[in-house]
Amino acid sequence: MSVTSDAAVTLHSRFARELPELAIGWQAEPAPAPRLLVLNDALATELGLDADWLRSPDGIGLLLGTDVPEGATPVAQAYAGHQFGGYVPRLGDGRALLLGELTDVHGRTRDLHLKGSGRTPFARGGDGLAVVGPMLREYIVSEAMHALGIPTTRSLAVVATGRDVWRETKQPGAVLARVASSHLRVGSFQYAYQYATAAKDDEVLRRLADHAISRHHPQAAEADNPYLALFEAVVSAQASLLAQWMLVGFIHGVMNTDNMTIAGETIDYGPCAFMDTFDPATVFSSIDHGGRYAYGNQPAVAHWNLARFAETLLPLIAEDVDTAVDLVTAALGQFPQQFDTAWSTGMRTKLGLSARVDHTTATALVNDLLVLLQQTRTDYTSAFRDLGRVARGAQPSLPFTDEWLSRWRACDPDPDVMDRVNPVYIPRNHLVEDALTAATTGDLAPLATLMTALKTPFTERAGFEAHAAPAPEDFGPYRTFCGT
């Protein structure tokens, strides 16, 4: 790693400085023949970075982590986590580095983080590397989520390294540069909790909680019990996030506790995908054999993950364990209602229903529609856009029943409201695969076209009809992979 005095970027090291017990200073591995595959110019501008400079050798060095600003302290972050329900006490950034924090043009602190930058002390048996396909998948899906208005980490760039990486076959290596409000996870607190338990001292755990409050939930600092208020804020953020996932048919695929953020942002797009035909049991991940993280299970899994977060905060919330348990149990109990409220409100909007439509009528319309979509194996995203056209007087092109349509039309749905929340374009699985396959062979044109469509997901565009259509029948069953 080289250090540059270039003033093009200033990186701070607040996490490394305030929480050294959760950070190991480390260096990225050099790339033999780096080549910039994709750069998010708009995000670069938002971060106060010069996109032209990022395309230069020095800029690409930053995106690889091999050329960092003077004073920066890249670290691999420590965290634990429940993976498919089983606890792993030491996970951490096995192939990732936090380069540092920067201040964007709006004054917000953002992490600059790398994925695929080489082995760290947390790598266990892994090679620490990443390949082009999965890194571009995260770029595609995270930016699509952002365009849909869903809280998420962002993707700044993907750089091909020129190194061959062995997975099932030889594949081209790559590094993803991503941006987040932070990379604090439930797993970060699990690691700090076990550290504090072993040391018989809660000081590290308290420092982590204070860091989280300062960065993400500053209003909690004013509460009578700041750490309980922190927990309540994370519960609310996750309830909102999960509802937004469900409303657009997003399936994360690997909702381990180390993949749940304290900021309430979606993180770690591994075996993720968007649902096509509606079915609550939909699973795409090749490693989720039991369907633990199926579409319909996601709210319950989030609730379970938050219970694990609550356990780590007990020593901070009250000296008496029973009192602390009672307090977090009450707070955790708010999650189902908060999720249901956000989901119900979102579904009313997707159907164009005004506040004049009573709750019972709206709920029946939603539930009956979902049953109908599942029975007819109708594409979830297409169904709501079709209803928007029906609300304007068109004939339905999908198999809605006359009885359901009659009840819905009687509610005078607003098609303009519907079109503002029901996307035309999502990262269709077959189109994502086409783009990744082409990019792996050096053809970036399908990726560029797909990203153009996804940038404005609610606006129909001439020439992009294929990007709004479901997969052809011969696409077959879809499976996703972690890429690790």
From Swiss-Prot:
Residues annotated to bind ATP: G92, G94, R95, K115, D127, G128, R178, R185, D268
Looking up Pfam families in the UniProt record yields:
SelO
Question: What GO molecular function annotation could you give as one example from this UniProt entry?
Answer: ATP binding
Top-level EC class as recorded in UniProt: transferase
Q: What is its EC number?
A: 2.7.7.-, 2.7.7.108
Presence of keyword Nucleotidyltransferase:
yes
InterPro entries for this protein = SelO
Cofactor(s) essential for the protein: Mg(2+); Mn(2+)
Per UniProt, Mg(2+) binds at N259, D268
Q: What reaction is this protein's catalytic activity? A: L-seryl-[protein] + ATP = 3-O-(5'-adenylyl)-L-seryl-[protein] + diphosphate; L-threonyl-[protein] + ATP = 3-O-(5'-adenylyl)-L-threonyl-[protein] + diphosphate; L-tyrosyl-[protein] + ATP = O-(5'-adenylyl)-L-tyrosyl-[protein] + diphosphate; L-histidyl-[protein] + UTP = N(tele)-(5'-uridylyl)-L-histidyl-[protein] + diphosphate
Q: Where is the active site?
A: D258 (proton acceptor)
**Keyword annotations of the record:** ATP-binding, Magnesium, Manganese, Metal-binding, Nucleotide-binding, Nucleotidyltransferase, Transferase
- Keyword Coiled coil: yes or no? no
Family to which this protein belongs: Belongs to the SELO family.
- Classification via HAMAP family: YdiU_SelO
**Role this protein plays:** Nucleotidyltransferase involved in the post-translational modification of proteins. It can catalyze the addition of adenosine monophosphate (AMP) or uridine monophosphate (UMP) to a protein, resulting in modifications known as AMPylation and UMPylation.
**Name used for this protein in its record:** Protein nucleotidyltransferase YdiU
